[in-house]
Amino acid sequence: MTSFAQLDIKSEELAIVKTILQQLVPDYTVWAFGSRVKGKAKKYSDLDLAIISEEPLDFLARDRLKEAFSESDLPWRVDLLDWATTSEDFREIIRKVYVVIQEKEKTVEKPTAL
């Protein structure tokens, strides 16, 4: 895993990405991978995001994410990858170099009264 310092996007772009993810998929961990993490991005290279979950992302959530990213002020495209439907071979490639963009929200249960 790498750090945010190695993610090749501007801080204001990262803020947009994180806001969209937090609003639409707060219960998922999200990793960036690909050229923007490996230091091989060109000016308009896309941002590859893996939505990490054991269950496939539902179509409505995926469509909302795609729409939010396409309507945002980001100067490049965001490609979404559903971890649950990704082959183990490709998962291994991603695991070599990625950046955590969002951690799954932890729900805190209230203690029950005795």
Swiss-Prot record:
Bound cofactor: record note: Binds 2 divalent metal cations, probably Mg(2+) in vivo, Zn(2+) ions are found in the crystal structure.
Quaternary structure, from the entry: Forms a complex with HepT, probably with a stoichiometry of 2:2.
Catalytic activity: L-tyrosyl-[protein] + ATP = O-(5'-adenylyl)-L-tyrosyl-[protein] + diphosphate; O-(5'-adenylyl)-L-tyrosyl-[protein] + ATP = O-[5'-(adenylyl-(5'->3')-adenylyl)]-L-tyrosyl-[protein] + diphosphate
Motif, GSX(10)DXD motif: chain positions: 34-48
CDD domains: NT_KNTase_like (cd05403)
Organism: Haemophilus influenzae (strain ATCC 51907 / DSM 11121 / KW20 / Rd)
Role summary: Probable antitoxin component of a type VII toxin-antitoxin (TA) system. Neutralizes cognate toxic HEPN probably by di-AMPylation. A mixture of HepT and MntA binds nucleotides; the highest affinity is for TTP, ATP binds more tightly than ADP or AMP.
Family per record: Belongs to the MntA antitoxin family.
Active site per UniProt: D46, D48
The protein, known as: Probable protein adenylyltransferase MntA
